[in-house]
């Protein structure tokens, strides 16, 4: 069944929260011929363990098994999506570390699948996956999916981000002044407070005043963390 993209766009835009939006995404996935749908978003922070949000209609128990087995860290679909926005067709790799992933997926009824990634200005990475238990993909279907998934993945991620990013990356809500951004940029260049003061023609005390304000706004413990957070969220 060919989706009505105009109606879908309206339904997406009027979704009141991320859960309603995902239900609309899953409905389009079914119209495209896929039993199952998954949308995952990975935030740029925390750096050591980025926050992740996952929504899915997979068979009961699969996502719990996926997460408990640490498949997210070895999933070649995620790896491919992180480096390319092209249509990804399962299986992406038959490397030894992913062999169990594909085997377990087939056992769960996830035999055929495609995925498409996208990014937002805040550095959030999104991956949309469509899957089914049977019916191999044809060349004609892949041609259709190349267009449909590009539209669906990008719109889904664009509209999901305003729901998810403020929750998972509260630093993204920070509003920095022009001077605070300048001080952060020069800090990122390795300049000391004294040197930044000379460059901006302000006192060292004023530089430190702006730095302290930034630390509070970004919930950072030091200047290094503040710069990392600001870059990761697109604030500078």
Curated annotation (Swiss-Prot):
Biological process (GO) annotations held by this record are: quorum sensing; regulation of DNA-templated transcription
State the UniProt keywords alphabetically: Activator, DNA-binding, Quorum sensing, Transcription, Transcription regulation
Q: Which residues form the HTH luxR-type domain?
A: 169-234
Note the superkingdom of the native organism: Bacteria
Q: Which SMART domains match?
A: HTH_LUXR
GO MF terms on file?
Answer: DNA binding
Specify the DNA-binding region ranges.
193-212
Per its UniProt record, what CDD domains does this chain match?
LuxR_C_like (cd06170)
What protein family does this chain belong to?
A: Belongs to the autoinducer-regulated transcriptional regulatory protein family.
Q: What is this protein called?
A: Transcriptional activator protein SolR
Q: Which gene encodes it?
A: solR
